[in-house]
Amino acid sequence: MALAYDGAIQRLIDAFANLPGIGPKGAQRIAFYLLNAPDEESQALIDAITEVKEKVRFCDICGNVCETSPCPVCADPRRDHSVICVVEEPKDVMSIERTREYRGMYHVLGGVINPMANVQPSDLNIAKLIERLKDSEVKEVILALNPNVEGEATTSFLSQLLSQTDIKVTRLASGLPVGGDLEYADEITLGRALAGRRAV
């Protein structure tokens, strides 16, 4: 049986281990780092987490994270409101913004279709997307989902759904590795994928 630490330190390790991308050893390193860190540093982390939980919300229009709704992208009159880029998560918005190649709007689904995890189309932010498309200003929807099985299934579902409209539906060009995540794509590759998007 593996040795566990007593009480509070083990609870902290377990809490960090529950975060994505952090395994048991990484969680232990972070916990002990905080144990030995100056009180101000630990308090700054506590304050940052508390502030995020209290202030950050999802944009009523696109579903991106923001402190005030609508988010800065939706509220910006200089953006191209005729194009909506559909992404899985808010972090994908930031990845695309870093390319400086895209000046349109976004729509965050909040996930992808995944029957294995019991995530159905009705669990995603699709109804709000359909509502937005009733605005005659929208001329193109870019499906910018991760090139993995779930992303492809969601892209296929959305392209069939949107084929009933007069809106041009495109997807990112190749260059992104199959099974990869937009979050990890470099700016040049992602920028080229946006520029070379193709009809679906």
UniProtKB/Swiss-Prot annotation:
Zinc-finger ranges (C4-type): 59-74
Keyword field contains Metal-binding: yes
Domain of life: Bacteria
Keyword DNA damage belongs to the record: yes
A biological-process GO annotation: DNA recombination
Record CDD domains: TOPRIM_recR
Keywords annotated in UniProt: DNA damage, DNA recombination, DNA repair, Metal-binding, Zinc, Zinc-finger
Signal peptide (residue range): none
HAMAP family linked: RecR (MF_00017)
Function in brief: May play a role in DNA repair. It seems to be involved in an RecBC-independent recombinational process of DNA repair. It may act with RecF and RecO.
Membership in a protein family: Belongs to the RecR family.
Name of the protein this chain belongs to: Recombination protein RecR
Organism listed in the record: Bifidobacterium adolescentis (strain ATCC 15703 / DSM 20083 / NCTC 11814 / E194a)
GN (gene name): recR
